[in-house]
């Protein structure tokens, strides 16, 4: 006779919920009950997951939520729920990732790993520009990208445009650690459509534009691509409007999905072509490791308007500006430190797998696309630049 061991009970508790998740049709909040045997004393507790299915690659991402209600309430992880004019807004509590913002059943950020996406979306374009003073942030209703942008001392003004005021109010309540940007005197918040705002903005207004939008489309169970409200932010008319309102040497950075998902990889190629058609140069795809997003990877497309000079000459300046931002060694401003971004990623994030590089760039000569960030030449112990770099930190 087979006797259930603790290991077999554990495997049942894990495997069965995942199997049930894989049988689910699409992105949704899921409550899954796993039971090992008929004996009530050996019954495995309820497991509460939220997951998203990527049918094109047969991949299901699931995060376990808390279930600490004494009454057995499987919704005890739900801290907040509201249907706004545009979407269903939820805040959940998870076991590993802390509080999570969920829009229309799709995880947007978690307290545990939101730093990776938001720091990269903000600091890569901000440090790429030599002295960004005026910045436009489109989307990013959680406030995290804005929070990071305002760490840069050169910033004089930020226009933050988001469509859904309910998302902003929700994040002010549940994620106050990132909501300080809206109280900063340099920020002007606009509750408006991002495409309409860009269309009505005068030419050559901004040094940097960051578009932190939600997914532009989804794919149903039959493989049909369904446009979502953010899709307008990825159309040629809007991309060209962003080009127009950037100053010369301006930087554009847009959220560009995961290269692991075929429809998203196709989108990266399309959006990059749109950027070039609108006049942008040096458009390139950067990668970010974010555990809570499908396949654990997401990326961005960054491009420049009429770039002048060699971007490789800025590498040492990036280190100096980074040190100025976070404060001198031993006296760092804890509110301005980063936990994911550091200057080597200014170049390193564009190092992508060969097959992805070939898919995005084809036979194109990409030698001019990437900043040659030579970490060795910026090492404070480098004899050649010892005097010049004596105050530049070395990040391990």
Residue ranges and their predicted role:
Residues 4-35:
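Terminal signal-anchor or tail-anchor transmembrane helices
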Residues 29-38, 190, 389:
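N-terminal, immediately post-signal peptide pro-regions of secreted/luminal proteins
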Residues 39-90, 295-385, 391-396:
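SAM/dcSAM-binding transferase cores
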Residues 39-61, 84-86, 97, 108-254, ...:
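The AdoMet/dcAdoMet-binding core of the Class I SAM-like
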Residues 92-94:
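Short beta-strand micro-motifs enriched in acidic
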Residues 98-104:
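Short polybasic amphipathic segments
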Residues 255, 280-291:
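Conserved S-adenosyl-L-methionine
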Residues 259, 290, 307-308:
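Conserved beta-strand elements of beta-rich interaction domains across eukaryotes
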């Amino acid at each position: 006779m087979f006797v259930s061991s603790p290991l077999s009970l554990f495997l049942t508790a894990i495997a069965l919920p995942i199997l049930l998740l894989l049988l689910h049709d699409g992105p949704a909040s899921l409550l899954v009950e796993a039971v090992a045997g008929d004996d009530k004393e050996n019954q495995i507790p309820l497991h509460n997951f939220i997951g998203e299915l990527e049918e094109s690659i047969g991949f299901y991402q699931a995060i376990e939520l808390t279930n600490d209600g004494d009454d057995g309430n499987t919704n005890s992880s739900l801290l907040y729920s509201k249907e706004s004019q545009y979407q269903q807004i939820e805040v959940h509590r998870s076991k590993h990732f802390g509080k999570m913002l969920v829009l229309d059943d799709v995880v947007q950020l978690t307290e545990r790993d939101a730093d990776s996406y938001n720091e990269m979306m903000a600091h890569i374009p901000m440090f790429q520009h030599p002295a960004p003073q005026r910045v436009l942030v489109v989307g990013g209703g959680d406030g995290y990208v804005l929070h990071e942008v305002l760490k840069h001392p050169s910033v004089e003004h930020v226009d933050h445009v988001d469509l859904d005021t309910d998302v902003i109010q929700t994040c002010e309540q549940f994620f106050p650690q990132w909501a300080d940007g809206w109280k900063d005197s340099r920020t002007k918040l606009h509750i408006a459509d991002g495409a309409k705002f860009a269309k009505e903005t005068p030419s050559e207004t901004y040094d940097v534009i960051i578009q932190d939008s939600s997914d532009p489309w989804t794919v149903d169970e039959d493989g049909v691509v369904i446009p979502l409200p953010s899709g307008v932010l990825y159309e040629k008319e809007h991309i060209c409007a962003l080009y127009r309102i950037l100053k010369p040497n301006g930087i554009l950075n847009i959220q560009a999905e995961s290269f692991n998902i075929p429809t998203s990889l196709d989108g990266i190629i399309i959006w990059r072509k749109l950027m070039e058609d609108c006049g942008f140069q040096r458009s390139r795809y950067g990668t970010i490791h974010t555990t809570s997003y499908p396949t654990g990877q997401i990326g961005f497309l960054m491009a420049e308007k009429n770039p002048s000079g060699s971007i490789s000459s800025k590498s040492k300046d990036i280190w100096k500006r980074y040190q100025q931002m976070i404060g001198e060694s031993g006296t760092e401003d804890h509110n301005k430190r980063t936990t994911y971004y550091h200057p080597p990623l200014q170049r390193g994030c564009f190092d992508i797998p060969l097959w992805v590089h070939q898919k995005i760039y084809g036979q194109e000569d990409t030698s001019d696309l990437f900043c040659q960030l030579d970490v060795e030449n910026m090492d404070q112990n480098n004899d050649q630049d010892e005097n010049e770099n004596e105050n530049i930190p070395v990040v391990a």
